[in-house]
Amino acid sequence: MLIASLKKYVKSIALAAAWVLTCSHAVADEFVALSKITVYVTVDWEGVSLDNDNLETIQEFRKKYPHIAMLQLITPSYWVRPDVDKSATTAQIKSTFLPIDQVGLHLHGWKSLLNYCQVPYQNSPSFADQDEACEAGDCGYSVSLENAYSEADLSKLVACSSEILVSEGFAKPIHFRAGGWQLGAKLTSALQANGFTWDSSRIDANLLTTNWHEDSGMIKMLKVLHADSTPLDQPYYLDQLHEYPNNAALADYTSSKQIVGMFNSLIQQQKTVMVLGFHQETAMNYLGRLDVAIPKMEAAAKAANVELIWASYH
């Protein structure tokens, strides 16, 4: 009788343990399934040119990936040069957009833009070690905004540039990336003074050494501006500005294999945000790298039981 009771007792304990184990596995599985990573695809419009080859490359990419929204970061110099057809320029730019996209501001120190905004043009220092003095044509692309201009002049430039985008039918921008990732305290203050809430100018300079020499102005300046940046950086508050580090750089500097590798590293380290992108002006040459990487990223996320979310803005 006693033995039968003990057997019954042990059996009940075993059943209870099995139930607890099953529930714990279910909770664990649910936890893993809830792991997420959000990927931001950004486009830097450099203000150089609007060549059909690049625009058509982007258009084809959008047809292939209509579910991926893009943050379109535009330098307004396209509209301020002599004899420009503003409406045609706007139409060309919008020809690459989808309704799910968001427009933000990207700034390079073009002389045409500085003159339009009535900010005294500075021709140095250059992150590309170039002579940015010119009497005719346009120049200033590689002038470091942070290092060349005062906070007051930067605030005036940001305000004026935002107004240009609004005048062309875009919403007032609140997203930003500095040309050459040249963001420091002065430009940060200028952005906040003009209502910007989101920036993606922080980057690990080592991600750019495929194109820039260690002794170049670009690498040296970025190692000062973003001294402790790494590819694992995650969003944080920079005063009132929400900083989203460009932790995967742009496709000009990273191969498809590297993009996927960085994505896997972020997953393995349980990071939740990846910011990558490309330049409009070089889309024909480098957008294909994202085209190759995206299916591999989606497959890697699925294999790791991680939900891949393509960032949305609406």
Cite the ranges covered by each PLM segment.
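Bacterial N-terminal signal peptides that target proteins for export
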Residues: 2-14
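Bacterial N-terminal signal peptides
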Residues: 13-22
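Active-site beta->alpha N-cap acidic-glycine motif
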Residues: 29-102, 111, 172-173, 275-276, ...
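C-terminal domain-boundary segment and adjacent tail
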Residues: 31, 198-200, 259-314
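Acidic-and-aromatic substrate-binding clefts and catalytic sites of carbohydrate-active enzymes
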Residues: 46-54, 75-89, 111-115, 177-186, ...
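CE4/NodB-like, metal-dependent polysaccharide N-deacetylase domain
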Residues: 62-70, 135-184, 266-277
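Substrate-binding cleft of extracellular glycoside hydrolase catalytic domains
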Residues: 83-158
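Active-site-adjacent pocket scaffolds in enzyme catalytic domains
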Residues: 175-272
